[in-house]
Amino acid sequence: MARLAGVDIPREKRVIIALTYIYGVGKTRAEETLAATGIDPNIRVKDLSAEQLVQLRDHIEGSYKVEGDLRREVAADIRRKVEIGSYEGLRHRRGLPVRGQRTKTNARTRKGPKKTVAGKKK
């Protein structure tokens, strides 16, 4: 396996897909990176030369925040919102959806499994 930005990327996959295994690199950034380095997106990772891997590593680490740095920045942003007491911070603290989604129904991913409430007797 080749290592880029501290991540083992799969050798058998096409480069454009393999780059998306790095946190902070999606399909668009993978395309931009390959265009900037002049590497064919359809080539397999195992077929890349050492020089091409170095080019990819330098471009990704030089141009984007990825992996640990990005995770730390996101966590710090959330922590800051919680500390200043903003509405978004409140939603994070309560474990509810942050971006205005409905919660009367749905939102089960954020709220967790249903808490059963005893029904009213007739």
UniProtKB/Swiss-Prot annotation:
Family of the protein in this entry: Belongs to the universal ribosomal protein uS13 family.
Look up keyword RNA-binding and say if it applies.
yes
What InterPro entries does this protein's entry cite?
Rbsml_uS13_C, Ribosomal_uS13, Ribosomal_uS13-like_H2TH, Ribosomal_uS13_bac-type, Ribosomal_uS13_CS
Record gene name: rpsM
Q: Which NCBIfam families match?
A: uS13_bact (TIGR03631)
Explain the purpose of this protein: Located at the top of the head of the 30S subunit, it contacts several helices of the 16S rRNA. In the 70S ribosome it contacts the 23S rRNA (bridge B1a) and protein L5 of the 50S subunit (bridge B1b), connecting the 2 subunits; these bridges are implicated in subunit movement. Contacts the tRNAs in the A and P-sites.
Please, one GO biological process term? translation
| Molecular function via GO | rRNA binding; structural constituent of ribosome; tRNA binding
Kindly state one GO CC term assigned in the UniProt record: cytosol
Q: What is this protein called?
A: Small ribosomal subunit protein uS13
Q: Does the keyword Lipid metabolism apply?
A: no
| Superkingdom to which the source organism belongs | Bacteria
Q: Which UniProt keywords apply?
A: Ribonucleoprotein, Ribosomal protein, RNA-binding, rRNA-binding, tRNA-binding
- Membrane-spanning residues: none
